[in-house]
Amino acid sequence: MKLGHREQQFYLWYFIVHIPITIFIDSSVVIPAKWQLGIAQKVVSDHIAKQHDFLLSEKPEWLYWFVVLELVLQLPLFVYFVNKFWNSSELQVNTNSRLKKWLRIYGWNASLTTLICIVVIFKRGYIPYDVLKTSLSMTQKCQLASVYLPTFLIPLRLCFV
């Protein structure tokens, strides 16, 4: 399935926006707080409080390694994809087998790791910083999962280019 012009523009901006999100937000799972910008710490802290994101609060080891993979594999790919989408015509993007291969690899990696996060949210979601680890309500789980859902669905489409 090819990417049309509008889809290419969408993914161009998706990757542009995802670069600072990866650097300042997602990286908070692996980078010690003393090396993070204050504003990034506040954004993460506010997100955890508002969305009850126990994963970003808890930072389980498996999530740590997912984020390491995001920083080592996906972040350089974001720059590569931005360059390719910015400087290529629709025909070039759809006929560039190397680009398509990397889009698929990114798609599978990002959608699978995010799917695991979503499953964990529904399986054991709880309110962060609560001593009793009170379970999230179904509404709260759905709200938190909806934050993760775009980073499952958007990359999933790339598995089929």
Curated annotation (Swiss-Prot):
Q: GO cellular component annotations, sorted alphabetically?
A: endoplasmic reticulum; endoplasmic reticulum membrane
Q: List the disulfide bonds.
A: none
Cite the ranges annotated as topological domain Cytoplasmic.
1-10, 83-101, 161
Q: Where is the signal peptide?
A: none
Would the keyword Nucleotidyltransferase be found if you checked this record's keyword annotation? no
Query: What are the EXPERA domain coordinates in residue numbering?
Result: 7-159
For membrane topology, the record states: Multi-pass membrane protein
Tell me the superkingdom of the source.
Eukaryota
InterPro entries documented for this protein: EXPERA, Sigma-2_receptor-like, Sigma2_recept
One Pfam family it belongs to? EBP
Q: What does the UniProt entry say about where the protein is found?
A: Endoplasmic reticulum membrane
Keywords for the protein's UniProt record, in alphabetical order: Endoplasmic reticulum, Membrane, Transmembrane, Transmembrane helix
- Free-text function comment from the UniProt entry: Part of an import route for newly synthesized mitochondrial proteins termed the ER-SURF pathway (ER surface-mediated protein targeting), which retrieves mitochondrial precursor proteins from the ER surface and reroutes them to mitochondria for efficient mitochondrial import. Acts as a quality control factor in the ER, promoting the proteolytic degradation of nonproductive and extramitochondrial precursor proteins in the ER membrane thus removing them from the ER surface.
Q: Which family does it belong to?
A: Belongs to the TMEM97/sigma-2 receptor family.
PANTHER family of this UniProt entry?
SIGMA INTRACELLULAR RECEPTOR 2
Record-given protein name: Efficient mitochondria targeting-associated protein 19
| Organism encoding this protein | Saccharomyces cerevisiae (strain ATCC 204508 / S288c)
> Lineage, please?
Eukaryota, Fungi, Dikarya, Ascomycota, Saccharomycotina
